[in-house]
């Protein structure tokens, strides 16, 4: 399944707020619709499916990519769900988003694809690149690159940067301090339901 490129508002109306996908807030449905929905029995499969879709759309990845991350998480030590979130959060496109260098993850992915971003002084144009502790992220020393990211930083630095990251506005440099903990996830998600969804596939 390819990456979603359709209307983002339609997705957040169905799944709720997904800050990685869009900074728009979904409008509440009418009470009559809510009432009819609440009267229906929602299957466990649908609940797991929706949690899985939240991860897919928030991080902007394909079905195959998410399944591969689940398989990697299963082989790692620790809680599969927590390791899965760590793998997704340490993607370069997500790190750029969480640092406030881009308004959304698709926006961050575009910066990476267009070679605006350096990791440890080397250009990286792979959005799925897995960052690690002590990696530092900087902007390519070109006027266009700096103008794009400075505008984003000025607008989005009001939002709190998670504890596992640091951004220096003076040096225009982001630092990955450590692997993040569960409390630093910027998404309301039950990752165990996602693991259960893939239990027969991974």
Swiss-Prot record:
SMART domains: Ribosomal_S4, S4. Pfam families: Ribosomal_S4, S4. The keyword Ribosomal protein applies. InterPro entries: Ribosomal_uS4, Ribosomal_uS4_bac-type, Ribosomal_uS4_CS, Ribosomal_uS4_N, S4_RNA-bd, S4_RNA-bd_sf. One of its GO terms (cellular component) is chloroplast. One of its GO terms (molecular function) is rRNA binding. Residues 90-153 form the S4 RNA-binding domain. The keyword NAD does not apply. SUPFAM superfamilies: Alpha-L RNA-binding motif (SSF55174). It is found in: Plastid, Chloroplast. GO terms for biological process: ribosomal small subunit biogenesis; translation. Keywords: Chloroplast, Plastid, Ribonucleoprotein, Ribosomal protein, RNA-binding, rRNA-binding. One of the primary rRNA binding proteins, it binds directly to 16S rRNA where it nucleates assembly of the body of the 30S subunit. Part of the 30S ribosomal subunit. Contacts protein S5. The interaction surface between S4 and S5 is involved in control of translational fidelity. HAMAP family: Ribosomal_uS4_B (MF_01306_B). This is Small ribosomal subunit protein uS4c.
